[in-house]
Design a protein with these regions (language model features):
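Active-site-proximal alpha-helical scaffold in enzymes
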Residues: 14-17, 85-109
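Conserved "HGTGT" condensation-loop signature of ketosynthase/thiolase-family condensing enzymes
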Residues: 1-58, 62-83, 89, 113-199
Length: 199
């Protein structure tokens, strides 16, 4: 059922979520995407403009939390699920949401990050998302000896607008998490997000 309902981006996100979840017990999940499955919305708008009928399935899957809802339904999981979109700061917003859930008592939180380039007619906007991607990780409160911190401060200087080695922001954060770098910084407008590894 899921395979027929979801588009490519949804399959990417669900594959990342299932791979990260594995056999672990259910936990709250934060789904994070700058644009979500915006191609569905564009198709619906095209159908409206041509006065052709809208697909109820496409309509129900065009909302930003649809992928998370499908994941929850398929797993029969009633834990807390949320969907966040915060432009260039989507990954940071997802981790802030995840930390809030940990602070509220959740032992673990899974974060699923996914996006793809904008479809026509939006391709003229700056390409913040250059390639389809999805990844997931599980968060838990640090034991005091090792872990990560994420802070946001006023940024000095001009924003750089590019992730590590020209990667999209979401993949720059993933690179930081898996490569063992000590620090990663992301400037957005007047804000500077600092990701720090504590050994």
């Amino acid at each position: 059922m899921l395979r027929r309902r979801v588009d490519r981006l949804g399959r990417f996100a669900l594959q990342a979520a299932y791979g990260c979840q594995g056999e672990a017990p259910p936990c709250p999940v934060v789904f994070a995407s700058r644009y979500g499955e915006v191609s569905r919305s564009v198709d619906l708008l095209d159908n409206l403009a041509r006065a052709t009928p809208l697909s109820p399935t496409s309509f129900s899957l065009s909302v930003h939390n649809a992928i998370g809802a499908l994941y929850s339904i398929a797993r029969g999981d009633t834990t807390a699920y949320s969907a966040v979109a915060a432009g260039e700061e989507t990954v940071e917003a997802a981790f802030v949401e995840g930390c809030a859930l940990l602070s509220d008592g959740a032992p673990e939180v899974m974060v699923v990050v996914y996006d793809e380039p904008l479809p026509r007619p939006f391709e003229h906007f700056p390409a913040q998302v250059k390639m389809p991607h999805a990844w997931a990780c599980r968060l838990r409160a640090a034991d005091g000896e090792s872990g990560y911190s994420l802070t946001c401060d006023a940024a000095a200087g001009a924003p750089d607008g590019a992730g590590a080695q020209g990667l999209p922001e979401a993949l720059s954060v993933l690179r930081f998490l898996v490569q063992g770098d000590e620090r990663y910084e992301h400037r957005v407008g007047p804000r500077l997000w600092r990701w720090q590894r504590h050994a």
